[in-house]
């Protein structure tokens, strides 16, 4: 018996050790207060400081794990290590950490560099950082002995017959489709520039991996062979397979820029960076000229509007200056005293202090987060990296992989007039989502976009579409921005105080009430996520199909009218409204423990009932928590889908419940009276009673005065007393 028990314990120990080893290999060494200082004192350490509850840390997590997994072969045998510090447990180690996530590079126990985390942080950028510090003595612009082409290599390249008739400067993987007959073998005769170490094993490179930019350019200059480069933004492990299986886009363009032009561009970029917040402080703006220059600067300014009479502004100043110091060389930071510069504060309707606004090229957005250093730095990092850029298919794939919510605007030459309106909305999305532009037919096919222009939002890989019924809707800035604000949350966000207004802004919200303390919480949450994703995907397909039918009908009417040359019919056909509206239903999950008191209004105790689903209409304060058969709504796809359809199409078929309030209001609402109507009726009745009371009092006073005399008091008027009063 003892031997069996001992054997079981040993097997469990081996399993735990194996799992720990795998986690260590993938995510890095977990460091504690006891061993952090001793470990980092030897060699080079790249360490992530994080909090499990931090949203930014959760976004960084997959990128960090994938980076460590891909870099472990490169760092094997070297003195380079990866580590992680959980700041919720290791308080001493995180005493000097002002914001999470923070990435530090240690060499022999000293911090030598910090990697800023922001919107531009990606798995590729982290890998590049690691590669740079693995080979600190290697200059990528200087070819090593192994990189220089030998005479034999030169003869081999010179003898190759060019497979393309035009000069080619970029080969973009997974971009616009080319004929599938163009396989990788057609490029086997091209010399490929060594744009990155990651591509040295790619089959697109038939010339030796020794070929560098300078040597290939030299060979190309003495022969008719066109120089071909390969985009470096390709996954190193899948590059070989992608070249054979992916579709290609060949873009004809001039050959490599001259060294002089490259040097000038580099100098301009470095000069621009030097001019951005060079001292790492907040600049005081007082003169109108300085203020106007800052507010219209293309580099962007993060500005605090305050008043010298504001007590709260003094409390914020420490965090503000600390943020400004961390934005050295990244983002311009300033402050404006509204007691002195009244014009600027009046121009931007500053109502309270302090107010934080980010300006870029005359557009601005208000920061509404907490005024502490960590939150200010997070927003400032995103503001520093803010841009609205053109994207291709690979960019959208990476954004989906990172779990980002992003808006995508499709346009062509005929719809370019709407671009300024769309660009104007971009800065309003700062801190919530990214805005991208594209003309790619491949991306349009992926997201089932059948006509341009079209604005969509992609959440967890699922596209939802801006409902533009007529061309004028694409010019309506407020309507577009309102739709964006209603859709910048993920498919299944967690209900929080900060986002509750956005979540309950729609007609109905499907709430998954979960208990994080249960063992199957993660599995249940994944099921809820899958249900929400599949519903929105199905709704997107239905909406696009109906939109296409309506559009075809409109085009048919226009063509018929033009054939008959009927001007009135042509005008009527062009004014034909394309009907169609996406489902307004939104999804969210609720922490039943945290929101226990609020859930009592629904007569729900999550600990007693377990996970369940309700459909809540916040505008009318009504909800559905049972099926037509009277059973609770379970977290199952068919059940949830049926309830949503019934609520949207025939809400009277299901018996709704009213949010629990005081007994009097609840009783009246049970007869179908709306709470707002009740308040209005109550107000009218109250005013009526007051008018009746004061009117009666006034009438009685006037009546008394009519029956009184100027000589006798009222009490003696009917006594019959007469006589002398002297």
UniProtKB/Swiss-Prot annotation:
The keyword Transmembrane applies. Residues 10-135 form the Thioredoxin domain. It comes from the Eukaryota. Residues 138-153 have a biased composition (Acidic residues). One of its GO terms (molecular function) is protein disulfide isomerase activity. Keywords: Membrane, Phosphoprotein, Transmembrane, Transmembrane helix. This is Uncharacterized protein C3D6.13c. GO terms for cellular component: endoplasmic reticulum; Golgi apparatus; membrane. The modification Phosphoserine is found at residue 708. Residues 133-153, 227-280 are annotated as: Disordered. The chain crosses the membrane at residues 675-695. It is a single-pass membrane protein. SUPFAM superfamilies: Thioredoxin-like. GO terms for biological process: protein folding in endoplasmic reticulum. It is found in: Membrane. It holds the Pfam family Thioredoxin.
